[in-house]
Structures are given as C-alpha cells and as structure tokens.
Regions:
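Glycine-rich ThDP/TPP pyrophosphate-binding loop and its adjacent helix/strand module
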Residues: 108-264, 270-277, 282-284, 406-517
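Glycine/charged-rich beta-loop-alpha catalytic/anionic-binding loops adjacent to active sites
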Residues: 29-36, 95-111, 133-139, 312-327, ...
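Peripheral docking tails and interdomain loops at the edges
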Residues: 263, 271-274, 385-387, 398, ...
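N-terminal amphipathic, basic-rich helices that act as targeting or association modules
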Residues: 1-79, 215
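Non-catalytic terminal/interface segments that mediate subunit docking, oligomerization
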Residues: 248-357, 362-372, 470-473
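A glycine-rich helix N-cap at a beta->alpha junction
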Residues: 86-96, 161-175, 368-380
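Active-site nucleophile and cofactor-binding loops and adjacent substrate-binding regions
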Residues: 39-48, 67-72, 101-120, 142-146, ...
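Cofactor-binding active-site loop characterized by glycine-rich and histidine/acidic residues
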Residues: 41-162, 298, 303, 312-313, ...
Length: 584
C-alpha cells in the first residue's frame, strides 16, 4: 500500500504520477470503511481525493498554506499530513475532528466549520506574508455550495486588489448540500459546458486570472494545472470540475443524501440505524405543506439546508414556488423573509442554531427594527445538538432574546410547537422565533389552547410552595423530574412552571411566588451568561428570593459527551436536588 508509507506531504512527492491513482483508490477505500462505521461527511471528501493529492504533490505545505472552506472535505488532507491512522485504524477514528484543526497539525491553519470564509482567511494570510516580505503560496479551496455565501464574494472582491500570489481552487461539483441555486451557479454551469471558454466569466469580470480543469478527478491533469499557477505573482482562480461522492455508486447517484452519512452497510448503502420516528423536521414539513395547500402566501425558506425542515427533494417539488432555497446565505434568507412579510406574505425560515450567529444583523436591523412578522424556527439549539466546536447550539438564547420586538418562544412538546406555529404564522404584530427542544421529540397528545398573543404568560403546571422550578424548553422535563425527586427525598412539594417565553418575564406570576416561595430555580438549554435565568435573577434583585440559575458555562466545547456536560453543569435532577437541600 502507498498510503501506509505516507507520513507527510514529502512522501506524496516520492510517488510517480502514474501511480497516484492507485493511492487515490486506497484513500477512498479507507474513507469508505471508516464512514461505514463512524459516519461523517462523505460526498465532499470522495470528490476531493485527487485534488488533495495534487495539492500536496505540487505545493510545499506548511510553507505553502492551504485553507479549506468549511473544511468538511479535509479528510484526504489529514490522511496525507501525518494523520492517516485516524482513517485506517478504528481505535484511532476519534483522534481527529471532522474539520481542520491547528491543534492537530501544522498543516491546518484555522479551526473552521462554517461556509464561505476561506477566501477572506487566506487573503489575510497572503497580506501578512507580503507585509513581512516573505514568499510562499497561499491557496484557498472553496466549493460545495460555499460560493453562494456573501463573505466568499466579499473575499473575492477584496482579493483582486492584493496583486500578489494567491490561488483559489474552486471545487465545482454542481452541488451544495442539496442542489445549487442562483445565477452564480448558472455561470459555473456555462463555464463547465464551454470548457471554461465562455466570455461570460464571473471570475474574469472581477479582474481575476482564470484556469479551467474539466477532469477535476484526474490527478495528472490537476498536477499540470497546479504547477502552472504555482508561484504566480497575482491572484488566479483554478476552476476544477469534480464529481461529488466519486468512487461509491450510491453516493454518485444520490448526492444530497450522501453529503453526510451515519454508519451504513457498504454493500447496500443502507443506514445501520434508520431512524423512522417522527421528529421536529418531519412535523414541520407536514405542517407547512398542509398550510401551503390552503394559503398561497405561505413560504418556506432555507439557506442551503432544506432537510432540517424535513423538505427532502420530493417534498420540495410538492411545495413548488412556495419553497425557496437561497443557497448558503443565511443573511439573505432573513432579509428575504422580512421583505415577504412586509408585502403580506407568511414566511417561515428554518435554521440550525449554529448558523443563527450569521443572521444577527439582519434579525436585528431588517426584521426587528421593522417589526416584520416572520417566523424563524431554530433547530438543534441544544446540548443534544451537534457537538463539534464549530457547530455548537448554545448561543442562540443570549443572541436573540436581547433583541427588541422579537418574541422568542420555547416549546417543550410537539403539541406546544404546533400551537405556537398556528399563532405565529397568522399574527402580524411581532417577529417570532421558536427554539425547538433538543433530544427526542416529546408528544403528550394534549390539546394546547393557550393564546400566545397574550405575551409573557407562564403556565404553572404544578402548584407547590417554598421551591419553584422554571424549566425552559428542553429542560421542562428536567424540572418535573427534579420536583418529583424533591418530593420523594425531602417531602417538598415544588411548584413547576413552563415559561414558554424566552424574551419576556411574567412579572405578575414572579411577584406572586414571593408569597410562599423562598427559592426559584431556572433551567435553560444554553449559555447562562446573558440568558433566560439571569433575567429572572435580575427581577428579584434585592428581594429575599434566592435564585439558582442552571445552564451551560460560556466556553467552546469540542466533540463532547452530552451527559458529561450536563453533569459538569449540575443539570441532573439528583444534582439540582442536592444543591437545593444544601442551602435550605
């Protein structure tokens, strides 16, 4: 095996060019076995094998600096830069993260996981190189839908003025996570169709030199192209036409499904753990499709992640023009929603919590200042969500709950969520965001009759005394568990409250609690600093009421175990009861 002898890029250069396809197959074989057992980003890495080999064959990493956009396609890069055991040995699968990580290797320059940042980051590396009078190539690798992000275009616009070495590899696999959208990708398609020769060329229009490689999975063709641009004294774009999922038939056929995979059977491609249970994604899709049938003003919006709302390809076709994918452009999605709402439409925007930070300015400026009645639903904003440091869902409460005019809601069950949607999609007075609970969806079959238009009215679900536990969203179930344990262990009949609202206080209820309670406990699925519980504590201020806030510490966690994090933050019923009894 060639791969077994690769301990760094210098070993790649020792292999004859006509033998490199054999190593490419070895890389795919290793990726296939690992993915079948461990899961991970699949299609992006299978499509980038030859390009990665060619990069390390031609350039001198780490002197020549390679920056991968999103870096979800960096598995072959890691295999060629001293980390192959993490892909060859099951015992070492967890030795590396799913993204580039400077703590792992000198060949990784940034910890990244969000799209469209590579050109700007690499431009910074190039600018610093020039200021210090150094040499060396700087390469940004971007594609897989990332060009649709505003920062990518901003970076291209700025980079044209550098007038020094800067190489941008555009990995064009004709896909984002799902299909591509927008005029930019029409131009890429035209460039592919004309072998890069059409006069209508986005990159040339921006003043950039341009090279096209039609055989983007031909390592010899790539090496030839990269050698031509190596040590260039100005910015050049190398546009490579690749096949997402190349080398594994199911992934080539169903590119969207195989963007990311869990463990699967190699022979059939079928997942080992096929989750057919109803979840918030499927519930959302079913709700919106039904609403669309009777109301042409309803619009579902995604920013490149349609299945987060349950909109698989067939569901998107069913929705027709009432489903909009703006590409990986969260800012545009929010501003678009505001415009639709102002002109009488009923926009619904679904987004992962980790990507909410990219929307902050538009939520504040374009939506909330204008009081546009959009509905924005936040997925995986939870300790139970994605656990990579680049994709944490802990920060949406402090971010969104402090924007004026926004009503931010937190259901605990399917029924509460649907009731909130019924209200939000029809009301025209407020921008509304809904934070979905983490973990498996809970459905209790109850009929929710609450009028959410009467803002900031909490619900007392169990009346007690001395101790009141306010459990927000995900942790409403934990509030009930802690109350039950308090009764069993100390005979304390605690009050349990479902607050529903993240953005406002039920001051009448909180004041009433002073009559026969001495301690209020708040539980929230997010960072405590600037969060929900702090607002409760501030309300009680100088009163005699003790307030105990439970949530997460302000820190970046990476590949964490959810149960361990909960215990570390005393977010178990046993720990909460122990804490309460220690101060009683």
């Amino acid at each position: 095996m060639y791969l077994e002898k690769i301990n760094g890029p210098e070993d790649v250069k020792k292999i004859k060019i006509d033998e490199l396809p054999v190593m490419a197959q070895e890389i795919r074989d290793a990726l296939l076995v690992r993915a079948s057992k461990h899961g991970g980003h699949f299609g992006p890495n299978f499509g980038m094998v030859e390009a990665t080999i060619a990069l390390h064959y031609v350039f001198e990493s780490p002197k020549d600096k390679i920056v991968y956009d999103v870096s979800h396609q960096s598995y072959p890069h890691k295999m060629l830069t001293g980390r192959k055991e993490a892909y060859l040995s099951e015992q070492h699968y967890d030795d590396v993260s799913g993204y580039t990580n400077p703590n792992e290797s000198e060949h990784d320059f940034f910890t990244v996981g969000h799209t469209s940042t590579s050109v700007s980051l690499a431009a910074g590396l190039a600018k610093a190189r020039d200021l210090k009078g150094e040499n060396g190539n700087v390469i940004a690798v971007i594609g897989d839908g990332s060009l649709s992000g505003g920062e990518a275009l901003e970076g291209l616009d700025f980079a044209a003025e550098l007038q020094s070495n800067f190489i941008i590899i555009v990995n064009d696999n004709d896909m984002s996570i799902a299909e591509n959208h927008g005029g930019l990708y029409q131009n890429l398609a035209l460039l592919r169709k004309t072998d890069g020769q059409t006069e209508c060329n986005l990159f040339k229009a921006m003043g950039l030199d341009y090279v096209y490689v039609d055989r983007g999975n031909d390592v010899a063709a790539l090496i030839k192209a990269f050698k031509e641009v190596k040590d260039s004294t100005k910015l050049v774009v190398v546009h490579i036409n690749t096949l997402k999922g190349k080398g594994y038939a199911p992934a080539e056929k169903c590119k969207e499904q195989w963007h990311y995979s869990g463990p699967f059977d190699i022979e059939t491609g079928k997942p080992l753990f096929d989750n057919v249970e109803e979840d918030y994604s499927s519930v959302t899709c079913e709700y919106l499709l039904e609403k669309m049938k009777n109301d042409s003003s309803v619009v579902a919006i995604t920013s490149g992640t349609p299945t987060v709302m349950g909109f698989t390809e067939d569901k998107r076709k069913e929705a027709g023009s009432q489903f909009v994918d703006v590409g990986i452009a969260e800012e545009t999605a929010v501003a678009l929603a505001s415009g639709i709402a102002v002109n009488g439409g009923k926009p619904f925007y679904g987004v992962y919590s980790s990507f909410v930070q990219r929307t902050f300015d538009q939520v504040s400026q374009d939506v909330c200042i204008n009081n546009s009645p959009i509905t924005m639903v936040i997925y995986q904003g939870s300790v139970y969500g994605m656990n990579d440091v680049t994709h944490l869902g802990f920060q949406d409460i402090p971010m969104l709950s402090n924007i004026p005019n926004l009503v931010y809601l937190a259901p605990a069950t399917k029924e509460e969520y649907l009731a909130m949607l019924d209200w939000s999609m029809e009301q025209t007075s407020y921008p509304v965001a809904i934070k979905l609970p983490g973990g498996p969806m809970i459905s209790d079959g109850s009929r929710v009759t609450k009028d959410f238009g009467r803002l900031n009215r909490y619900e007392v679900v169990q009346t007690g005394e001395k101790i009141a536990i306010i459990g927000l969203g995900t942790f409403f179930e934990l509030a009930k568990e802690a109350a039950k344990l308090l009764k069993e262990e100390a005979g304390i009949n605690a009050t349990v409250i479902n607050p529903y609202y993240i953005t406002g206080l039920d001051e009448a209820l909180l004041t009433k609690l002073k009559q026969n309670h001495d301690t209020v406990i708040t539980l929230e699925d997010g960072i405590l600093d600037g969060g929900f519980g702090e607002k409760i504590a501030r309300f009680y201020g100088t009163s005699n009421m003790k307030v105990m806030n439970y949530g997460l510490k302000k820190e970046f966690l990476d590949r964490y175990d959810a149960d361990a994090v909960l215990k570390e933050n005393h977010l178990t019923a046993e720990q909460i009861v122990e804490d309460v009894l220690s101060i009683s």
